[in-house]
Amino acid sequence: KGVPLFYLPIMYYPLQEDDRATGFLMPGFGSSTYRGRSLSNAFFWAISRSQDLTLMHDYFSVAGQGLGAEYRYILGPGSQGNLRTYFLNQPAVSYPGVSTTTAAKALSSTSKRSFQINGNISQSIGSAVRIRGRADFFSDVTVQQTFQTNILQATQRSRRVAGNATARVAGFNTSTTVDWAETYFGDTQSTVNGARPRISLRSGEKPIPGLPLYVSLFSEYASVLRQGLSKNYDADGIPEVKKISHSTSRFHINPTLRIPFTKWQFMTLNSSVSWHGTYWTKSFDYESKEQIESGVDRRYFEFYSRFTGPVFSKVWDTPNSSYAERFKHVIEPSVSFQRTTAIDNFDEILKIDGIDSITGGRTRISYGVTNRFLARRRVQGDAREVLSIAMLQNYYTDAQATQYDRRFSTSFNGTAPAKLTPVSLIVRGSPTDQVNATLRTEYDTRYGAFRTISADGTVSLGERFRTTGGWSQRRFVEGLSGFNNRSSLTHFINSATTFKILDNRVGGVYNFNYDVQRRRFLQQRILAYYNAQCCGITVEYQSFNFMGLSQYSTFRNAILVDRRFNISFTMAGLGTFSNFFGIFGGAGQQ
């Protein structure tokens, strides 16, 4: 009857007709230059209609064995969660041509066990309380780098665990957060940031009776931590960890008075005055560069005004256009002024997060203009923004403040203090639902050069075809510290394309990441599948360049490129799965 047929020596097949039937899933077979041959199996347990559990096992002929589990549940709107755990046992392996560095020997020749935990939870308790939790934790960064299929996961430098509870009490929004995050710089240095706990109380704006004024309040208690960790290996490959730690308790209160002015349609003015009071139980001795037990406090006022307008607009009809019957161009200039009173003890404050890095005795003037182009489509009949162009620059009376301006991506790159920030340009275009693109760049007006440029976009043709692309470049600027070292420049291109034809019976994926600066592919991946009425097959091939991880890992061996091949079969009513390292483009999802 024209139904394709294939044979396997052994096949297990649950006969239940329920789409969520309990049973074994189809295994995945693979081969890797680094991991050896692999076999991945999974058992799916449909506990109930609202929860399930998947147990997984991976066998690698060279890299050992792994066990994993994924639990998912949905109790109702706003109450759901998932948790994934994985344990990997790697035997002692000495790869040919391993680097002679002591650290590389220790990483490549000794057996080790590692684990990872990933999860999200969101739970509502009544109508006023919500609990959230998130975990993205791994015990060994080198496992992430060498096992993960997704390059974003392989180059992930941070691991984090966080929990948060919010509630509304007597008109106030309360939040309690406990978080811990570690960011790696290579596999021998890292920085830890955390709060245990961070408790905040916030009131919404309330009008003052009889006056056009609004008042709000924010207060916070936080026990914050920042650690610098470095690991050095001795002659026997045994690591020695050095720790530099800063921690303190902090009390912060911030009342705000806002004065709006919205009587003119073509121009709006919002002004506010805030008082900030902060106390730290510990401080920083600038001469000895050490944390001391003496407390320190800080008090300052902040005055802020933002003008938007005058807004100019022009509308014109296009009766002969097949795209839109009418266009509108809106020009929206804006300027804001912010004055922060003097902070005389800035050098005595421990710099742990953003609140601690505020500089005083300065004025910031921010100015920019936004152009918006809107079109009334003939088909949909509604107006959509097809193009927007936004430019922004800040001026500070204190040049030091530009080094802490989080509105600009290049502020924390070791550039010399300057009163003018670069000009930020963001262009977004979306002429249809199927096409969109974004361009971002920062231009240094002092040196007449672009610091960074990035662009990304998407083109799709319904469910049949979709492609995304991205480009980013960190450019060389002669004389500008942080951008005048050619070895630290970056230039990347990435793309991902998927297609589905014949009612999704045939499809495929191709994606790549290319390092233009060093003229090499970081990774290339090809996936193809065929689904018939009764069965199907999925094949995947990936070439992953370990040399692209040179800025993160000291692990070096003769395997410069890991070539990975995976294959899996499907049958009607019997699903397949992706292991924890993302074969077939997933991340533990079946």
Predicted regions and their residues:
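Outer-membrane beta-barrel proteins and related beta-barrel translocases across Gram-negative bacteria
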Residues: K1-Q590
